[in-house]
Amino acid sequence: MSGKCDNCDCADSTQCVKKGNSYDLVIVETENRSMDTVFVDAPAAEHDGKCKCGTGCSCVSCTCGH
């Protein structure tokens, strides 16, 4: 069974690295006020312009959406 990581073929799609930014929204409520905090994770790493689809799959010929 094979998965697909954008245009990279991976043995298991769960090994695909999520590309782009991901946002986590945390709402903290205190007595009379609330504070909204958004954490932004860095984009998934690219190695010399090549996709890395996890530890078991290194894609050397894909373009990573470029």
From Swiss-Prot:
Keyword terms: Metal-binding, Metal-thiolate cluster
UniProt cross-references to InterPro entries, sorted A to Z: MT3
KW Metal-binding (keyword) present: yes
Chain segments annotated as coiled-coil in the UniProt record: none
Disulfide bonds: none
GO terms (BP aspect): cellular detoxification; intracellular copper ion homeostasis
GO molecular function: copper ion binding; zinc ion binding
Cited function: Metallothioneins have a high content of cysteine residues that bind various heavy metals.
Family of this protein: Belongs to the metallothionein superfamily. Type 15 family.
Name of protein: Metallothionein-like protein type 3
Organism: Malus domestica (Apple)
Lineage start: Eukaryota, Viridiplantae, Streptophyta, Embryophyta, Tracheophyta
